[in-house]
């Protein structure tokens, strides 16, 4: 019997396991593979604070960034980049950046002028620019390295038990059934991403969930190392 069962070893599952283990709970993680294979390791690894809505979203993003800093120190995950440039190529995007800067409660953000970005090594590659908003609050990790490293640390140092190759067939109140065993816990968290559609199709339909895709393109290196990520309009 466990205190917590987490199904899925992507970032959402790892986050639940991290907090549960830090609170002293006995944690079991289950997944069909030995490490995350989906969006957790295919995405950019941004921890984005700037632009979040005030209310619940912004404090949550600020707290998430603080937690990631703690995780990076404890686990030994490198923070690849800090801060961010939000680049506006159109007048409409420039207006959005200025409106955000005027209305946001976040401190430390500022608009950069041509004299600022043209001195940067990447300046010649940016094309025609209207404005750039600089934020010091963002973080970026390498998810292909950081996600497996966090799982390994949880198993080796936080007492988390991990069962790979565990295909969850059915779930109920306080239990999870796989072909080889039935596991019980006080709390069960399903962090399956779009695999939830196969396990609990009625839940998927009830919330009218839809699968989405993100298109990414890896470029040939241009010989420039950026201190911070850049996010641009089209």
Where are these regions (language model features)?
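Hydrophobic anchor at the start of a short beta-strand
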Residues: 27, 109, 188
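Glycine-rich, N-terminal phosphate-binding loop of Rossmann-like dinucleotide-binding domains
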Residues: 9, 51, 89, 192-193
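Short loop/edge segments at beta-strand edges and connector loops
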Residues: 31, 81, 113-115, 162-166, ...
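Dinucleotide-binding Rossmann-like beta1-alpha1 core, especially the glycine-rich loop
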Residues: 44-120, 129
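Flavin-dependent oxidoreductases
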Residues: 15, 171-173, 181-234
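Helical element adjacent to the flavin cofactor pocket in flavoenzyme catalytic cores
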Residues: 133-179, 183-187
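Beta1/beta-strand and adjacent pyrophosphate-binding region of the FAD-binding site
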Residues: 1-12, 28
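Glycine-rich FAD pyrophosphate-binding loop
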Residues: 21-41
């Amino acid at each position: 019997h466990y205190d917590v069962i987490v199904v899925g070893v992507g970032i959402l599952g790892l986050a639940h396991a991290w907090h549960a283990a830090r609170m002293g709970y006995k944690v079991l993680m289950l997944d069909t593979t030995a490490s995350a294979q989906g969006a957790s390791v295919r995405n950019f690894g941004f921890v984005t604070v700037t632009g979040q809505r005030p209310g619940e979203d912004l404090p949550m993003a600020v707290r998430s960034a603080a937690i990631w800093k703690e995780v990076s120190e404890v686990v030994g995950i490198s923070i690849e980049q800090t801060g961010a440039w939000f680049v506006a190529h159109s007048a409409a995007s420039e207006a959005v950046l200025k409106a955000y800067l005027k209305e946001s409660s976040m401190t430390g953000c500022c608009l950069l002028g041509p004299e600022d970005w043209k001195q940067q090594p990447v300046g010649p590659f940016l094309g025609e620019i209207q404005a750039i908003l600089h934020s010091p609050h963002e973080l970026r990790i390498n998810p292909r390295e950081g996600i497996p490293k966090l799982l390994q640390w949880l198993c080796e140092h936080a007492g988390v038990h991990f069962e790979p190759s565990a295909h969850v067939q059915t779930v109920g109140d306080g239990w999870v059934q796989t072909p080889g065993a039935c596991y019980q816990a006080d709390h069960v968290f399903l962090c399956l991403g779009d695999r939830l559609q196969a396990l609990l199709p009625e839940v998927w339909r009830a919330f009218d969930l839809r699968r989405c895709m993100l298109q990414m393109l890896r470029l040939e290196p241009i010989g420039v190392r950026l201190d911070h990520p850049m996010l641009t309009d089209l």
